[in-house]
Amino acid sequence: MYTEFYGILVLLIFSVVLSAIISGASYILGDKQPDREKVSAYECGFDPFGTPGRPFSIRFFLIGILFLIFDLEISFLFPWCVVCNQVFPFGYWTMIVFLAVLTLGLVYEWLKGGLEWE
């Protein structure tokens, strides 16, 4: 069947099991007594300067999300460039459609003013 993917499957299963073990151990062994220090906001080791939960600019959040989207796009482009000549017709047009959708999304965001920093 797909024997070349067994290594990835084993790695995936190992990662999930190890994550579950570590999370379970943290939950079981962790201290569950909340006090003032545990429920207060953490600001780089200093006492909080203001009230916790101050709102931040939603623009900052949107720019961060856009950065993550286009950062993931680059992570898809690098492996595609390596095997482009092996998957030429289908892989090429698939990536062109992928890039076109992302470009249309960027143009839409630009026209709606999502990239303006005020």
Curated annotation (Swiss-Prot):
The EC number(s) this enzyme carries: 7.1.1.2
Transmembrane segments: 5-25, 60-80, 87-107
Keywords on record: Electron transport, Membrane, Mitochondrion, NAD, Respiratory chain, Translocase, Transmembrane, Transmembrane helix, Transport, Ubiquinone
Topology with respect to the bilayer: Multi-pass membrane protein
PANTHER family according to UniProt: NADH-UBIQUINONE OXIDOREDUCTASE CHAIN 3
HAMAP family from the UniProt entry: NDH1_NuoA
Protein name (database record): NADH-ubiquinone oxidoreductase chain 3
Organism for this UniProt entry: Metridium senile
